[in-house]
Amino acid sequence: MSLEIERKFTVADGWQVPPGTTGEQLQQAYLSPQGAAVEFRVRSKRDARVMTVKTFDAASGAMVRQEVEFEIDDAVFTQLWELAGGDCLSKYRWNVPLEHHVATVDEYDGALAGLRVVEVEFGSLEEARSFRPPDWFGEEVTGSPAWSNRVLAASARAVPDEQGETR
């Protein structure tokens, strides 16, 4: 089990992916209900399928989570994906070098098209707290439930009908 220490921000309008930056397409599905103390996620990226289990460390604040990841085969991935009941999302991820860190920029597809967020991971809580974001980072949304991928996946599924009701 490892600690994940990160901060999350929106991406400022007008920001462009730097030339030569590499990225990859990701698909994620969430198996645990919103607000659960333990989050279960499956992810497909390139040739890998990964199961992730995250717990939230209330004592350390919103920036710190315990995380376990392990590879699963295609058949298990497909079965778990179907169990997610539509709480899925698709996004393209770029890794943008910063001076001492890497900014992970996610641009969402489908119902979330146009939404972009950036995360930076750190080796310690002190390092995370002292980080000064570059100008192209927008509002900080670390710890905001509305900006969690789990909530975004559920909101992508909630398509309004003609009367404005979600189904």
Where are these regions (language model features)?
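Phosphate-end processing signature that detects enzymes handling 5′-triphosphorylated RNA
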Residues: 1-167
